[in-house]
């Protein structure tokens, strides 16, 4: 697949067009709208919706956003003058059918399938969030731990092998997106 084909997935909002580059893979069924900045070697998989319409979305390098995930933001208001942008760091794996809304994620994070992270939540680097977890608004998850549940609870410190896996997971998806870009 030619990299130029993904431009059909990019839509402007109020004259602001998503910023992508030739190292990105964006599946033809994904939709990216408005003020969204995507760093190098990011992959956006089938049926992802990313709406940077009422605030900004930033996705760091080597990050993968898997099938069916929704990325959105919180509008600026008198109660919340800056709103809540969505900031996703580098080497992040966002599993299938997650919802990330106006939150901040550091680097080397795995967000398990079906997890929901709400407005104002801060996820520090080197965190593993289990499948189906709910991170409530304004909650901070500190670095180096496994979190699961609804609402999310800190379970235990990550093992060295699990911390290494966080980075490896993102690199696996960089390799996969490179295969897709080559048409393999």
Where are these regions (language model features)?
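Thr-Gly-centered strand-to-loop micro-motif
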Residues: 27, 52-53
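Short HxH-centered metal-ligating active-site micro-motif
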Residues: 93
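N-terminal beta-strand/beta-hairpin edge segment
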Residues: 46-48
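N-terminal segments that cap or nucleate solenoid repeat domains
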Residues: 4-44
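Glycine-rich hexapeptide-repeat left-handed beta-helix
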Residues: 1-20, 53, 59-74, 78-86, ...
